[in-house]
Every structure is written in C-alpha cells, then in structure tokens.
C-alpha cells in the first residue's frame, strides 16, 4: 500500500509502482530482455507509462494493475524464489546425509514440467549456499513483518529465513551499506 499512501499524500502528481526483476549480476541484460513489465497505480498514469515502455519494449507483455497488486507481485516472486532456494538447500543437506547425488535428483525431477530449473543449484551462482544480496533478505523480512501486522502467521516464511541463516551464517546482506536491508 506504499504507492497508494504516497498518492494520497502527494495529490499534485500521480505515482505508479513498476517492480524491477533484475539480478545484481546481469542487471543490464535483464533490463533489456524483460519478459514482462508490470505497472501499478492510477489509470491515466499507468496508461502513460505503458505507452512510454511500449516504444522500447514492443513485444514484451505490459500489465496495468492496481498498485497494491503490483507491489504484491514483487514480494510474491522474491519470496517464492527465496523459499525455493531454502528448500533446495535443505534437500541438498538431506541428500548429503543419505549419500544421494543431489544434482541427479534435481536433473530427474526437472522432467516434471511443473518444476522450473531456476534457484535449485546449491551452492548458488555466487558460490555460496542460501540466498544473499539485497532483495531476497529484505523482501522476505518485509513480508514477514507485513503478514504479522495483518494478523497472518508467516510460519513458512519464518522457516525459509531460519534455513537461510543456518546455511549462510556469514549474513553477507548485512554488509551492503546504504541499502535498506542493512539499515536499522
């Protein structure tokens, strides 16, 4: 509801929310090759922003929606992927303890088209277990806080966070100075 709150506070301008889905390692390529663009906010403004994006991203699906929905999409994606990383790390621990080849398990599980290959490598692309960076830790903890504020017990998200702290004890996200995830 941040965008709605800002629109109520600053009535002389229209504020929209356009979540970015960029990885830190490939942000330029990710931006150039977006597979969808989501714009949330008041209608006249979202139409104007959609028209601006359409000039550059002629084949990319562009979705206009309410700002709360657009904000929620960002949290859904990041928290789902964080959950997938934590699940993969826990399953890797189980495989290691049972003397099972985790990579073969993943290879054969991916024959099931319902399971996508992203975020299943452990260690991940940074050579470490779990998730770090600025987005997943920040967004997961923000959603835990929000869920608690609206009376929902975020037990699954708590489990995701505990597993990440277990497999990534160095907490590298805390070293990211000047980013919201590292600030009190």
Regions found by a protein language model. Name each.
Residues 1:
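ADP-ribose/adenylate-binding Rossmann-like module
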Residues 7-18, 23-118, 146-153:
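Internal alpha-helical scaffold of NAD(P)-dependent oxidoreductase catalytic cores
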Residues 51, 96-184:
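NAD(P)-dependent Rossmann-like dehydrogenase/reductase catalytic/cofactor-binding core
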